[in-house]
C-alpha cells in the first residue's frame, strides 16, 4: 500500500473515536432507560473499540512511517472528545441508577477536575508556545491518558453489570471502582501541578509583558 493510503487508514482510525464514543453514549443511555443488558454490552464494546483505536493509530503511524503534524494534533483532540463524552455519560448513569449519591459526587469531582486540567494545560501550552518553548506532551500526560481509557471502561462495566452479580461481590467491586477514581483524581491534580511548575516561567513572562 502507498504511504498516502497508510496515512488515510491511520487518520480514519484516529477519527473513528468520535462516532464510536457517541454511539456508546446513545447505547449507554438506552441501556439504562430500558434496563437492557444487550444494549449495555453493546455500549461496553463501543467504548472498548474507541479506546483501542488510541493504541493502534499511533502504533501504525510509526510502523508505516506516516507520523504527521496533523496526526499529532488530531490524536489528543480525539482523546479529549472521548473523555468529554464518556465521563459525563458515566456520571449520568450513576445518577440514573440512584444507588449511591457518594459515588455520584466522587464522579462529579473527577469529571470536573479532568476537564479543568485539560483546559488549564492547553492554556499553559499556548502561553509557552508564544515563547517558542517545547510544548510536547510529557510522560505524565501520556500515562494519565493511557490509564484513563481502561479506567472509563472498567467503571462502565461495573455500572452496567453490577446488579447481575451476587451481593457479596458488589462491595469489593465498588471499592475497586472508588480506588480507580481516586488514583485518577490524584493523577490529575499531580499532572496539573507538574505542568504548572514547568510552564510557570512563561506564564510570569506573559503576565509581565507589555
Give a label for each model feature.
Residues 1-11, 15-21, 38-51, 128, ...:
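C-terminal membrane-associated helical module and adjoining short loops/tails
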Residues 28-32, 93-96, 129, 158-162:
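Short helix-capping/hinge motifs at transmembrane helix termini and TM-loop junctions
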Residues 115-134:
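Membrane-proximal helix-loop-helix units in multi-pass membrane proteins
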Amino acid at each position: 500500500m502507498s504511504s498516502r493510503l497508510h496515512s488515510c487508514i491511520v487518520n480514519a482510525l484516529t477519527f473513528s473515536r468520535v462516532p464510536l464514543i457517541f454511539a456508546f453514549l446513545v447505547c449507554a443511555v438506552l441501556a439504562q432507560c430500558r434496563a437492557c443488558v444487550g444494549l449495555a454490552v453493546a455500549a461496553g464494546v463501543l467504548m472498548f473499540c474507541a479506546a483501542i483505536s488510541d493504541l493502534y493509530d499511533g502504533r501504525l503511524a510509526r510502523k508505516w512511517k506516516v507520523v504527521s503534524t496533523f496526526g499529532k494534533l488530531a490524536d489528543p483532540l480525539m482523546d479529549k472528545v472521548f473523555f468529554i463524552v464518556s465521563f459525563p455519560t458515566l456520571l449520568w448513569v450513576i445518577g440514573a441508577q440512584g444507588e449511591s449519591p457518594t459515588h455520584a459526587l466522587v464522579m462529579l469531582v473527577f469529571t470536573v477536575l479532568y476537564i479543568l486540567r485539560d483546559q488549564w494545560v492547553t492554556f499553559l501550552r499556548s502561553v509557552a508556545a508564544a515563547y517558542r518553548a517545547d510544548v510536547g506532551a510529557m510522560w505524565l500526560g501520556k500515562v494519565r491518558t493511557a490509564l484513563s481509557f481502561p479506567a472509563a471502561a472498567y467503571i462502565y462495566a461495573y455500572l452496567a453489570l453490577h446488579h447481575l452479580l451476587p451481593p457479596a461481590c458488589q462491595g469489593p467491586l465498588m471499592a475497586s471502582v472508588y480506588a480507580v477514581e481516586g488514583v485518577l483524581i490524584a493523577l490529575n491534580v499531580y499532572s496539573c501541578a507538574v505542568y504548572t511548575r514547568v510552564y510557570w516561567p512563561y506564564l510570569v513572562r506573559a503576565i509581565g509583558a507589555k
